[in-house]
Structures are given as C-alpha cells and as structure tokens.
C-alpha cells in the first residue's frame, strides 16, 4: 500500500481486506495466549524461524501484527515491534545495541526517564553514555569512543521541544559506522519521518500521540532496514550465529528486519515486556485519527505560543516556531506543517509562582503524561526531571519557574481563557 497517502495508510495498513475468519472490517482483538500447529514439522519450523508465524502470545499476536505493520508503514520502515510501553521500546533498543560493554552518545535534552536510564540504570549493566550538546557536531563527534554503539536523539526534545539536525547527525553517525536511533514520540510520522533523514531505528512511546487519548500504554520500535549490522563487528548478537536458535544469524534469516527480529526473538522472548492485544487494539483506534488530531494540536499550539509570547507575566517561551528561538531554522526545515505541542514557558517569578499557576488551571490536567487529546500541564523540575541534579537541570534548560504544557484539542478559546485565569490567580 506504499502508493497511498498517509491518511489512507493510517486506516488500512495491516488489514487491507476484511478479517479472513469473520469478514470483520474492524481489526479483531485476538485474545489468545498460544496457537495450534498443523503438525510437529510445522511446530519445528516455527520454532526454528524457518516459518515466520505465530508461536506464543509473548512473541506475536495478530492484533499486534496489524499495529506493527501500520506504524512501520507510516514511518517508512521495513518492520516494527510493539511492546508494553515506550520505556520498554527504548530499553530493548539500547540493550540490543549496547550489550557487552557498549557506549552511547546521547542528546542532553531528552525525556527525564530516558536520561535516567542512560545515566544511572544501564551503567549498572556495563553500558555507559556521554551526553552532548546535540547542536555542536564537533562535540558529538569528539564523544564517540571505540565502544560506541549508537547516537541517540529525539526529534523534539523533552520538555523544551529543541530540534536536532537529523540529516547532519545521521551523516556523522554513518561516517563512524554507527546507527542513529531517533525517538519520534513528539514528532510522530505525520509531522516528520526520521528514516527519510537518515535514521536507522525509530522508537515511540505509543502511549502519547499515536494512541492519543491517555488510555493505553505501549511502545514501538521501527527498523529502517538499511543499516549494515555485520560491517563493523560491533553487533555480533544480530549478525553472528546465535546459539539459542541453533546458529541462526538474524541478518541472514531476517534480512532488512534483522534488528527488530533479534529483539523479538531474544530480548522479548526472555524478558517478556509484551503488549496485550487489547492495548494494541486501542492504539490502532488512536492511529486511525492521528493526522486529524495532529492538525488540531498544531493549530492550537500556534495560538497558545502567540498568546504566551506577548503575555506580561511570561519571562520566556521555549518553542522553536518563534523567530528568535535558536532552533527556528531547523523547525522550518523539519516541521513545515507545525508541531511541538509539548513545550515549556517560564513564568515571571520562581517555583512558588509556577506551582500557583498550575494549581489554578481548570481544563489543563496536572499529570505525568503528554500528547493527550486533553490539555496537560506539569512542573518538570519537581516531577518528570526531578532525578536530575541542579546542574543537569540547568543543562537541559529547566528552571524553577519552568512550566511544561501539552496542548490538546479543546476549543482554543477555552484553552486561552483557562491560561489567563491561572495568570490572574498568580498576580
């Protein structure tokens, strides 16, 4: 279906014809733990990866399969793997690349959970990192070590929506024989497709814009299909014969889909962060309206940014659509249709004023999620990024008076009125 437009793909990929068993047009929920084999030879072929069909619900499910095919198509990848959460998608990706003493070069201004994973959790397993100013390519290149396994970035940084130059970073990564991993949770494939700019692996917290309604946890790993896993010798688990599958090389067995096949067959098999068919179904419902929702998110965001930029109680708005933002040129290059509905601003005053503003909002919900159809708010320094030191917070541009907004799809007049009411409460 690659000839179809995005809006058509988000509705049809993975179920181009009605369900063969029932003729249902909607994707069925296949609530089963396991699958019947035709005979012993059939079972052996499945377990030996000679026949790429269903074995057990921890590895594959037909509802999950539709979700994977759909997101892979929307991102322009060759294959995808859906897992239980965005954190699981990121963790599996980094474990697959970094095992046996690997090192990552990572964007400094990323989601606090990803920062904590790289800086504190993975080092306990022998995997290290260097955080860099992603806009300084000389600093990025200088951070690459002999054991570096990948460069890790986000299309829109969390929480300030800063934008890396994906094209340039991809060239740099490939110059050193490294894959570029891009978290496209905030960008979404509707606004930007990192694989088209040189990314090799794309990860998502599907909980956010893909699902879109704050109901369902899920994560997605998309394989771009073009990276040579055998060339450098740094990825033997993917390229070399695997003893737990009778010497199968995932590069030879799965071809362009080697990366996600390895994670499914080894890491998911052995650690089990499996997405449920019910969660996969709910995420598919969200994806069907992704383009429609993103257009409204972007439209509302433009108006909120303009409102805040000229508000007398606002010290600064951190949004790349503003002409004086340091990433404005990159925003125009990579996001011609808008975006960045998760961003921060700094209220005049300090933490007390920020908290009072947040506590007086009515439509905006104070919670840890983002990218919901509903508008959301949080104080990053005391919540999502509270594990960071004072210096780390400063490096990420998070101050005591920083407030993160996630602009929803409510009527813009109601959103602006709610913000103004909270400002008046702070006076």
Regions found by a protein language model. Name each.
Residues 39-91, 113-120:
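Conserved N-terminal alpha-helix of the aminotransferase class I/II PLP-enzyme fold
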